[in-house]
């Protein structure tokens, strides 16, 4: 398919800058993909569509405070550094993006904190904006991580809100976040509350977790019209033996497997057997799903309403059908649904 087939007009005021007061009270549109029927509900009603033995698969990655503000040595120019991933624990090496990156060269030192207590040296150029930094810190690894993260803030994309608030530290994290490593939060998971989990238990709806450490590749602009030529950034994926068995047990028993979010959709489809079962996995995935594509694992998916031409929209359209999903998005625009990470959700059955 073509990139232009996923375009639509979305004004900035339709992108939610704050979450709803209660996580599970976001709006929920339900798309029945075979008939094209649409329903308008609240997210807490999602359990009405599932029953005993159906299994929700969620991403338990934990967002770390990835955005730092600092200054360049000598000139004192302001810079923003976005931590992408740790490359070497012992040497304090990190893969980062620097903005503005112009004139940030190998050998330059960058200073962070009001007292410039944390210093990093640029040791490599990876892309036009990408750099490898070595943080110069004499204390223990635990002390280093504490100092580094104390200076950071959550990376809430600029198109969501221009300035991060203290509340985002909690709001931009799922209640089940467990394994630190994500720059970006799994948006669909943000809607789950403890009360909703308790109601799932009462209905004998199962849940399990996989880990996908989301970077910023989901936000990267697709710049090719032919989608087969687009390449996704790699993300760390971990599916435990226990999670794989729970998912496969549901499939064998004729129960529904529900993928919560685009990252889970990608993760479940990364390493699948010929009998449509999930294998345990610990590695990297750059799987890019777009129509036409036949999913092997999920029987239903949940996703937020995403921006035009985003890879996440494409993966949803691959499951629900391009025509039906784009019609649902058109309905969402007409009915005042909120888009983006803090926005409303779409359930596709």
What are these regions (language model features)?
Residues 1-349:
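Surface-exposed, charge/polar-rich loops and edge strands
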